[in-house]
Amino acid sequence: MKTGRIIKSISGVYRVDVDGEMYDTKPRGLFRKNKFSPIVGDVVDFEVENVTEGYIHHVHERKNEIKRPPVSNVDHLIIVMSAVEPDFSTQLLDRFLVIAHSYHMRPRILVTKKDLTSLEKQHDIEKLLEVYENMSYKTQFISINEDIEQVFSSWGDGLAVLSGQSGVGKSTLLNKYFPNIEIETQHISKALNRGRHTTRHVELFERAKGFIADTPGFSALDYDHIQKDEIKNYFMEIHEYGATCKFRDCNHINEPKCNVKAELENGNIAQFRYDHYLQLFKEISNRKERY
């Protein structure tokens, strides 16, 4: 029995990487019976049938799972924001940070298009990034000429997935790091006589110190798995200062003897961060339950 990570899935065949050796595997019938399918990122135990093929017997417990695209066991969520077109948004950034923490992923903030930004706006963005750096978030502000190898290798060990809204440069980053992915995709689409909206299969590729998914990541923010009382745990400074509030169930809104409100008044919590917390708390409080 061998253990490896699924790096690719096509038509019920799962390619498993075991220390650089590849095996094309299929799940045992028990998986179909239980209506459970392995996904890219899963760590699996499989039995080798011949030199390069085998059957999956067991899928290890997932530490997290992204639905769109379906990827499991993600270590790093690279939140890609652009300086311009679209403009840098702390509100959107904070929402992606909440998603990252809710799935127990380590977030990193990557801002693109520095070369297209005025010096004044660069300074404004750098001042905002300092707020996040003071909370121990890792940040990068890059231009088109950046050393892409160094950018990707700085993320540390494990599986990284890019996230961010359309137009921020996720696909550009991936195609620069893997220059043959786009060519291969176009070739396959043309061969299958499909349009430009051909669905891509998720695949993991090796990078320095780990893997990265070749998908441009997810851009839709889904909070269905988050309850309103959990949001305070995903704003790092609010979680930290909230530990000394008078009441353990304090949501830091109108409650008495709230340490978060006191630290906000003292300037230790950025007003825009607190405002974004309130907005998200209200949204989740007002959502209709799905049945």
From Swiss-Prot:
Keyword flag DNA damage: no
Family: Belongs to the TRAFAC class YlqF/YawG GTPase family. RsgA subfamily.
Pfam families reported for this sequence: RsgA_GTPase, RsgA_N
GO process terms (BP): ribosomal small subunit biogenesis
Subunit structure: Monomer. Associates with 30S ribosomal subunit, binds 16S rRNA.
Cofactor note: Binds 1 zinc ion per subunit.
GO molecular function, one term: rRNA binding
Enzyme class: hydrolase
HAMAP family: GTPase_RsgA
Cofactor(s), names only, from the UniProt record: Zn(2+)
E.C. number(s) listed in UniProt: 3.6.1.-
Domain of life: Bacteria
Positions contributing to Zn(2+) binding: C245, C250, H252, C258
Protein function: One of several proteins that assist in the late maturation steps of the functional core of the 30S ribosomal subunit. Helps release RbfA from mature subunits. May play a role in the assembly of ribosomal proteins into the subunit. Circularly permuted GTPase that catalyzes slow GTP hydrolysis, GTPase activity is stimulated by the 30S ribosomal subunit.
Alphabetical keyword list: Cytoplasm, GTP-binding, Hydrolase, Metal-binding, Nucleotide-binding, Ribosome biogenesis, RNA-binding, rRNA-binding, Zinc
Protein name: Small ribosomal subunit biogenesis GTPase RsgA
Subcellular location as annotated: Cytoplasm
InterPro entries linked: G_CP_dom, NA-bd_OB-fold, P-loop_NTPase, Ribosome_biogen_GTPase_RsgA, RsgA_GTPase_dom, RsgA_N
GO CC annotations on file: cytoplasm
Domain CP-type G: 63-221
Binding, GTP: T112, K113, K114, D115, G164, Q165, S166, G167, V168, G169, K170, S171, T172
